[in-house]
Structure formats: C-alpha cells, structure tokens
C-alpha cells in the first residue's frame, strides 16, 4: 500500500512513476523457474539466495535453465565465503583456514557452520550450507571445475587480506584494486567462463581479461563508495589511505559534518568516483559480447544500477552520513533499459554520465578528469551507435506534457462545474 506521502512524491516526480508502471505491466520473463518439479534442496537454495539478495535472485531466476542452478550455486558458495570474511566476531585463526579450504569444503555434503556472529546477515546460509553442497554435487563437471577454481582464488585472496590486517584499512590504490579483484574481479572471471562454456557469450571475452576485470571492479568500487559510512561505523575502511590522506589527517574528518571537512570529503569522493568511472566503457564493451537474452539481462542490470548509484553518490555529502540508494522508479527504468538491447543500455549509461557531468564542480581538483571519463563513455556509444539519441529524455518530456495537459483538463472541468 502506497502512503499519502508516497503518492505526493510520485505525482511531483512523474518520471519515477512511469517506469514503475511499465515494469509492472509490460515486463516479460525470458525464462521462468519450474518450481513444481524442484527438490527441497533446490527450493532451499533459492530461499537462501533471496535472503542474501532479493535483487539478484529476481534476475538469476530468469536465466536460461542450462545456467540457472550452476550460477545460483556459484553465488551461494561465494556468498558463504564472503560471510566468513565479513564476520568481525571470528578471529583470524578461525577465518584463515575456513577461507583457504572452502574450495574443498564445498564437496562435503554434510558441512555446516554455526559459529557466525548472531547479527551476521547471512549466517543462516552457513547453518544450512549442506543443501548447497548437495546441489553443487549435481552440477555438471565442467561447471564444477570453474566454481571450485574461483572459490579457491577468492578464498586465498580474502585470507591474505585478513592475515595482513588489511580489512581494517586499505593503504594503497593497488591494494584497493587487488581487494576488489579478489571479491569481485574473480567473480567476473568465473561467470564469463560459465557463459562461454554454456555457449551464451562470445569466446573472445575470455581473451580480454581487462574487460572481465572492469565488470567486477566497477560494481565493487561503486559499492565501496556507497557504503563508506556503514563501513566506517563498523571500523572498516576500504577507501585507500593513499587517496583519503590527501584530504584528511584521519578518516573521522571525512565523515565529520563540519563544513570545511565536508568540502574536502567531497573532493576525496570525486577521486574515488573517478577510479570507478574509468571502468565504465569496458563494461559496455563486455556487455555487447553477450548473446543470449537472459544472460544479457543478468550482466546488464547490475552495471546499469552501478552507473546510476555512482551518479547518486557523486558530489553528494549524504554518503558520509548514511547509506543511500537509488529510487524504485530509477531502478525500474534501469531494469526496463537493461532487459531490452544494447542500445537501451547505452542510453542508460549516457543518461547518468551526463548527469554526473552536470553535477561536476569546476572547483573540484578532479573536474577535468571526471569530464574526460564521461566523454570516454560518450565516445564508446557514438562509435557503436552514431545515430543513437537519448530517446528517454524525449519520452520524459512527452510524459510531462501529457500529465500537464491532464491536470489542466481536470482543473478546467472543475472550474466549469462551479459556474
């Protein structure tokens, strides 16, 4: 039920309401789960997938049946790994062997873990991990090899950061990108190998690891920018000291509401946004190499959400006060764009890149570099689709005109009735 406040919001922001209605009414599923024929373990896997990420499960469940369970299991395995790494109640002595051996643990169909902290978001996944392991055992050997290899890479990478104490503060930019590689870049590698193995993506994608890496880096870096306040409150700092030390003596100054500190904090966030934004054209290049529609949706939606989130965070002091997220209307518009074709995905990227440019502050030390990164996105799109126009802007204008005419019509009718 929409509140009165919500109704007023959408009436004053009609560009938010239209995509929500379109998504609800017109969106069709590329594929659909056959829940009637699923075993209890399969249903349990989807249940825990939904607990870990509602947005991801919605996209995952529409995948081609060939990839549906392998990717579901892949995600749950890595989520289990991530849950161990994230748990601040576990000592390094407990974490390290769990992380390094997780690629063999997934073959134990009776393994469960009950020692996660009581407030750990995904502890139930580990408590009932045996159902994931049993379904993993049924996955094709070709997919099993890929999942095992990526789990080993990620587990060892996470363990290295835990042992070195990096999770309480990343020092250098190269450390930051290495961390993002282990928690997201290798995920992109695994997904690409699964896509190519299933013959739903161009094999040439595997020949360009830079594109694969950028897909993971773009998502993870955007999440780290958005979550800066939440991580600070948990005494975890992923923004590299090499960056933030240019703007503050300690990290507390960045999240301080004092005006002179806030200006420096925004300049720091601009540098963080710039690092992520420079990956955007690689992401578009990767997406264009995906053939099958459900897989296209699967890779395009998160990237479109990321560029929108990056735009929301850019020059936004609220990121230092609370966790922020894009609106439902924006999310629905992005999902509409990302489940059609490459041209619509490009329109979404162009739309948000232009908004970033519009928000760009000439007094910011990264002003010119931010503009250059946005122009790089424009050049990629113009190179692929030289005649592509931002039809969304035209559609929004037309919708506003129709709405205004409707309001004027109602007002005129009311006035006539009073005569």
UniProtKB/Swiss-Prot annotation:
The keyword Heme does not apply. GO terms for biological process: ergosterol biosynthetic process; farnesyl diphosphate metabolic process; isoprenoid biosynthetic process. It is found in: Membrane. Disulfide bonds: none annotated. The chain crosses the membrane at residues 397-417. Its main location: membrane. Pfam families: SQS_PSY. The keyword Transferase applies. Its EC number is 2.5.1.21. This is Squalene synthase R6. It is an enzyme of class 2 (transferase). It is a single-pass membrane protein. Belongs to the phytoene/squalene synthase family. Induction: Expression is induced on squalestatin S1-producing YMG medium. Its cofactor is Mg(2+). Signal peptide: none annotated. GO terms for molecular function: squalene synthase [NAD(P)H] activity. It comes from Phoma sp. (strain ATCC 20986 / MF5453). InterPro entries: Isoprenoid_synthase_dom_sf, Squ/phyt_synthse, Squal_synth-like, Squalene/phytoene_synthase_CS, Trans_IPPS_euk-type, Trans_IPPS_HH. Pathway: Terpene metabolism; lanosterol biosynthesis; lanosterol from farnesyl diphosphate: step 1/3. Coiled coil: none annotated. The gene is R6.
